Amino acid sequence: MADTESRKEAINFTSPYHETVYALMVNAGTQYENATSLADFNGASVLGQKDTALDWTIDQIEGVNHLTAVASVPDMIARLQQGTCDAIVINLENAPGYLASNPNFVVISFPEGEGLDPGFKGACVGLRKSDDALLGLADAVLATIDQEQRDELWDTALNNQPT
């Protein structure tokens, strides 16, 4: 769960167990396929997922045509396949799964600090405000898992998703 500021008011979060990086996904063969900066998307029609940072971050692109958000990532992917948008906002860590199912897509990622800023650190465990002991235990367990193990676990989860 993303540790957004509004969510922090209602629940407690562990330290992030996986960093969240946002990117844009486009169709191969379009003018955006070789984009290297957010500025390259000036005038592009970009789509996000309703009520998530996959939508809120679109306005960080100057001159963008911010399309009305859709309900889910599969809806976003369908719209990109249909060509009714130029790009969609995605979590970069999920890109391998999207590309496996959609070989005509291209992921555009950006150097650190030059891409979309979701406004939170990453994926965390969310707990009730009253669960302080459990929060401490969860953070202690997460601290025993090094980055290599976390990446392996994430990759295993991605590889076991239905395509």
Model features per residue range: what roles?
Residues 28-32, 42-45, 49-53, 115-162:
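Extended ligand-binding regions for polar small-molecule ligands
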Residues 1-5, 28, 51-52, 72-73, ...:
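Beta->alpha turn/N-cap motifs
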Residues 51-61:
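Aromatic-rich, solvent-exposed beta-strand/loop patch
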Residues 24, 46, 67, 107-108, ...:
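Generic preference for hydrophobic
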Residues 1-40, 106-118:
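Acidic, polar ligand-binding/catalytic clefts
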Residues 48-49, 65-73, 79:
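Short beta-strand-to-loop elements that line the ligand-binding cleft
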Residues 24, 41, 80-81, 138:
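Hydrophobic residues within well-ordered alpha-helices
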Residues 8-12, 40, 60-61, 74-96, ...:
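Short helices/loops that flank or line small-molecule/ion binding pockets
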